Amino acid sequence: MADLDVDIVAVEREIWSGKATFVFTRTTSGEIGILPRHIPLVAQLVDDAMVRVEREGEEDLRVAVGGGFMSVTESGVIILAETAELESEINADEARRDSESDDPATAARGRARLRALGQID
């Protein structure tokens, strides 16, 4: 099966780089799934996005993403995020607390983190 080269990079660090069979996320135009050999595009991610990376023979990788862009070429996907956290790095209680914040940016970050944990859609 064909693979995508996927790079997820936040302002402060590289989050993940590797091979995937499918990438799913939410953009300002709606939800999108990327398979190998997808048409090229550039899309803006929503502020409370979750990126799901499906990998052959491995568990899905879930990343909470706070804003940024996605670039798709025939061979791969690059996610350039303002903030990003792997599911394994997220504290559920803190994410829930943040999602209820009066500050819109903090609330969006909390929702993205809860999506990565699979606790909200």
From Swiss-Prot:
GO CC terms in record: plasma membrane; proton-transporting ATP synthase complex
Cell compartments where the protein resides: Cell membrane
GO molecular function, a single term: proton-transporting ATP synthase activity, rotational mechanism
Keywords noted in UniProt: ATP synthesis, Cell membrane, CF(1), Hydrogen ion transport, Ion transport, Membrane, Transport
Topology in the lipid bilayer: Peripheral membrane protein
Principal place of residence: membrane
InterPro entries: ATP_synth_F1_dsu/esu, ATP_synth_F1_dsu/esu_N, ATPsynth_dsu/esu_N
One family name in Pfam for this protein: ATP-synt_DE_N
Claim: Transport is one of the keywords in the record: yes
Subunit structure: F-type ATPases have 2 components, CF(1) - the catalytic core - and CF(0) - the membrane proton channel. CF(1) has five subunits: alpha(3), beta(3), gamma(1), delta(1), epsilon(1). CF(0) has three main subunits: a, b and c.
Annotated function: Produces ATP from ADP in the presence of a proton gradient across the membrane.
Family to which this protein belongs: Belongs to the ATPase epsilon chain family.
Full protein name: ATP synthase epsilon chain
Species the sequence originates in: Mycobacterium sp. (strain KMS)
Gene: atpC
